[in-house]
């Protein structure tokens, strides 16, 4: 591999992210073509991938993608569920065309289909899951970049990026690193955190939304009785009780004129008396 600018070299944080996301964890099975990318085999039979090779291939693939003038000619594909959000975020940041979910057969070979595309390069998440897209791309001479695991077949794959393609954090981080490297080569940078590329379970998202709504409703209910209750108490207090409260607290204005004419009330009572 040729020398690359210092900005594209991995930092300690990048290596820590790769290790934390378990990008180097492979499977118990290994394809013979993946031997150059396997670091060693653990005692429990799990193959460990070489993170240095992973970073080299990410930079190599990013340089290929950055060389394409029209980003829409890049087609990013993920049939695996953990990569759906990642390819959509990648397409939003770079302007590529995303296919998240089931790949429609004939999208690259049958021009009659509504989903027909003619990309210059495709990037897939898993060669086993996205085998239909890889095979069709080989029919029409479209280069293929793919993330591969220790047991992934490399048939029709032109650029293989070794990594764990079965973990939600690993898949999201690999797509995030590829997106960031492409933008850096083009002179920009990625301001989105890796968490935005991670897969999120719809049930988990809905549950979090319900919990947030319940917490907000509970906070609203606890705040309302303090004001409404005080208003109800003040409205139900009799006038005499209110006067007593005012007297006890010393808030009575003794210089003010009385609201009731006691002399007039006495005269009226004598006039209406029936004793005479």
UniProtKB/Swiss-Prot annotation:
Subcellular location(s) of the protein: Cytoplasm
Main location: cytoplasm
Signal peptide: none
UniProt xrefs under Gene3D superfamilies: Glucose-6-phosphate isomerase like protein, domain 1
Database matches in CDD domains: RPS2
HAMAP family: Ribosomal_S2_euk
Oligomeric and partner information: Component of the small ribosomal subunit. Mature ribosomes consist of a small (40S) and a large (60S) subunit. The 40S subunit contains about 33 different proteins and 1 molecule of RNA (18S). The 60S subunit contains about 49 different proteins and 3 molecules of RNA (25S, 5.8S and 5S). Interacts with RPS21.
Name by which UniProt lists this protein: Small ribosomal subunit protein uS2
């Amino acid at each position: 591999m040729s020398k690359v600018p210092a900005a594209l070299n991995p930092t300690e944080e990048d290596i820590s992210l790769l290790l934390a996301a378990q990008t180097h964890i492979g499977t118990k099975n290994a394809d013979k073509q993946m031997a150059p990318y396997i670091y060693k085999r653990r005692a429990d039979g799990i193959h460990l991938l070489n993170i240095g090779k992973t970073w080299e291939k990410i930079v190599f693939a990013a340089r290929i993608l950055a060389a394409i003038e029209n980003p829409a000619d890049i087609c990013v594909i993920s049939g695996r569920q953990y990569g759906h959000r990642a390819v959509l975020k990648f397409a939003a940041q770079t302007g590529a065309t995303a296919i998240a979910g089931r790949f429609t057969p004939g999208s690259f070979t049958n021009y009659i289909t509504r989903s027909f595309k003619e990309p210059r390069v495709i990037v897939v998440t898993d060669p086993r899951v996205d085998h239909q897209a890889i095979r069709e791309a080989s029919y029409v001479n479209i280069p293929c970049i793919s993330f591969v695991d220790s047991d992934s077949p490399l048939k029709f794959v032109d650029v293989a990026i070794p990594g764990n393609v079965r973990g939600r954090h690993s898949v999201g981080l690999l797509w995030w690193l590829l997106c960031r490297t492409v933008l850096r080569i083009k002179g920009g940078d990625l301001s989105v955190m890796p968490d935005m590329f991670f897969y999120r379970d719809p049930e988990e998202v809905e549950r979090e939304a319900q919990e947030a709504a319940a917490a907000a409703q509970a906070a609203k209910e606890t705040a309302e009785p303090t004001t409404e209750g005080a208003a109800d108490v003040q409205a139900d207090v009799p006038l005499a009780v209110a006067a007593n409260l005012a007297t006890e607290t010393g808030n009575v204005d003794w210089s003010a004129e009385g609201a009731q004419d006691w002399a007039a009330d006495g005269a009226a009572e004598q006039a209406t008396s029936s004793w005479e």
